[in-house]
Amino acid sequence: MIRYFTAGESHGPALSAIIDGIPAGVAITKEDIDRELRRRQQGYGRGGRMKIEQDSAEVLSGIRFGKTIGSPIALVIRNRDWENWTDKMAQFSSNEETTEKISIPRPGHADLAGRLKYGFNDIRPVIDRSSARETAARVAAGSLARTFLRQLGIEIGSRVASIGSAEDTGSEGPLRSLLEHGAETLSEAADRSEVRMIGEAAGIEAMASIDRAKEQGDTLGGVIEIFITGVPVGLGSYVQHDRRLDSQLAAAVMAVQAIKGVEIGPAFDNARKPGSEVHDAFTLMKGEGVRRPTNRSGGLEGSMSSGEVIHIRAAMKPISSLQSPLQSFNLDTLEPVLSRFERSDTCAVPAAGVVIEAVVAPVIANALLEKLGGDHMDEIRERLERYREALRSAFTG
C-alpha cells in the first residue's frame, strides 16, 4: 500500500515528504518530480511567492541508479523565502516574546478554528501549516505514483472548466479527441494556456476576469476536471465502504486546500434527469469487450472502475486572503476590526488541477496494487497484462 506524509511550514526551511509502498523497479528521474513541481507553480493570477520559489526536489532515500528500491522515499523541497523569515519562524530562539503575534483571523481560513483548537497565542503556526504551499510536497509525492502508473499505461490529466463566470463550454469535441491519445495529452494541451483552458476564447475571458478581480482586491475560484485513462475494469470494490474507489478519490480531492465540492462524472446534472437518460448502456465490441457510447457514470460503477475514462469534477472556492478585507475581530482584545491580508494569489485554479492530478495518483495506484499485488515493477506489469488478457478473453468466442 502506498502512503505518504508531508511536513514543513510555508515559511520554514523546507517542505518534506516520506512516501512508503512504491514498488521496487520503477524507473524514475529527478525531472519526473521537478516537472510536476514546475507545473504547480504556473498559472495566471498567482502571487509574488511564485517569483521567489523555484521548486526542486532533493531525493534522500529510496531510489538507486534511477530506480525505486522498495524502501521509503524521502524528499525535501527547500523554501527560498525562508531567508526572509528566519526570525519569525525560528525553530529554537529566545525571541518569542518580541516577535510580532498575529491575533486577527481571516474569514474563510483555518486561522480562527486552528488557534482555538491548538491553544496558540499567535495565528502564525496555523497560517504556515494550513497554507497551500504544503501542496508542493504532495505534488512531489504524487509524481512517484504517477510515474508508476504511466509505466503501466495509466495516465492522469486535467483541465480548467471554469474560472469565476468564465466557462470553457465549447471544448467537448477537442476534449474527447485529446483523451483518445491519453489523459496526459489533454494536460499538455491545457498547459499551453495560462489558465489551463482548452478553448482560447474562454481562456482570454478568464484572464480578463482575474485582472478585474485583482484590481478590485478580490479573488476567484473555479471548476477543474480530472481525467484518468487506461484504468482496467474492476479496481476498487463494493464489499466494504472503505474500499469503494469513488469514495477514496473524493476524499483525496476534498483534502486539497480550498476544494469545497467534488462529483464523479456530471453527477449533479445526472441528479436532475431520469435514469433512462443517465445510465450508460452496454455495447459488446468483438475483440474489445464492453464499451459504452456514453460515460455519464464518470468511469465508476458500483464504486469500481468500469474500464471507461474516470472523470472527476472539483469545485475550488475563491482564495480567502482578500486585499479588500472582510470584517473580523482581534482575538486578544475582542475588538471588531477589518481582517488582515497575507500575501496570496488572486486565482490558483490552474495550479489546483496539477495538485489534484497528484493526489489521485496514489489512490489509483493502491487500487491497482490491491487487485494485482506484487513487489517489483516487472512482476506487477506481468500480472496486469495477464489480467487485461483475461478481460479480453471473457468477451471472445
From Swiss-Prot:
Coiled coil: none annotated. It catalyses: 5-O-(1-carboxyvinyl)-3-phosphoshikimate = chorismate + phosphate. Pathway: Metabolic intermediate biosynthesis; chorismate biosynthesis; chorismate from D-erythrose 4-phosphate and phosphoenolpyruvate: step 7/7. It comes from Chlorobium luteolum (strain DSM 273 / BCRC 81028 / 2530) (Pelodictyon luteolum). It is an enzyme of class 4 (lyase). This is Chorismate synthase. Keywords: Amino-acid biosynthesis, Aromatic amino acid biosynthesis, FAD, Flavoprotein, FMN, Lyase, NADP. This reaction introduces a second double bond into the aromatic ring system. It holds the Pfam family Chorismate_synt. FMN binds at residues 129-131, 257-258, 302, 317-321, 343.
